[in-house]
Amino acid sequence: ECTQNWLSDLKLRASWGINGNDQIDNNATYNLYYTNMSNGSYNFNGDGTTVLPEVQKDRSGNNDLKWEETKQLNFGIDAAFFDNRLGLTLDYFQKKTTGMLIQKPYIGVIGEGGYKWYNAASMDNSGVEATFTWRDEIKDFKYDISFNLSYYKNEITELPDVIKYTWGGGNGVDKTIVGQPYGSWMSYKAAGVFKTKQEVYEYLSKYDVQIGAPGVGRIRYKDLNGDNIINTADMDWQGSDQPRFIGGLNIGAAYKGFDLSVSVS
């Protein structure tokens, strides 16, 4: 009885499930060949005029391929207050994807057929989604306002050693996207710009600069690993093209036979 004056409805939700994904080439389990005239051709009938192309193996099939597997856990709340004028929807989700289907870079040591599909990566996703709605009416005028906000977190959790430092933008040596969000990118970190020739001289006296050309008005790069050398080893993860926060606002109004709606995201 103590909630009747303000709580109109309350629902709790929970779900768990497993989904699969097989979105790769239909022929990924088969060896793939193609014809090539430039690297080799043959004259089988001996007349010296009829030339047939050679056949090269481009990709090796993988009979052990299986679907990606995504386990997802969801918790949710649906609530309404003040005679259903105020609404709240809140969701939390957690997704773990294993056996992601990826094609490794060409493996030259095996000769022909160096491309191959594998179940070889894992990724975690989690987030919170909230929607707040207010709706009311004043005589013939009705209106509703809805605001939604979402927070997402993504992380690559596993890659095979052969592509650990190259797939997804790694530097190929010692920095890997494992532990970073999908869509991450690497770059140099700036420490301002050179304002005078004296600053340029001092910078060149201190560092062995192997990238860029220091000069007045140009970017000064940081020596991240402290070896007094400015090179590709000083690149680091700078961010991701995957947004952490997403929000939107929807406003609707109606008066007699007229209505108006506005959406912003």
Locate each region found by the language model.
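Solvent-exposed loop/turn elements at secondary-structure boundaries
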Residues: 2-68, 87, 91-123, 176-178
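Residues on the lipid-exposed face of transmembrane beta-strands in outer-membrane beta-barrel proteins
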Residues: 1-2, 14, 75-79, 90, ...
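Conserved small-residue
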Residues: 26-29, 33-35, 137-239
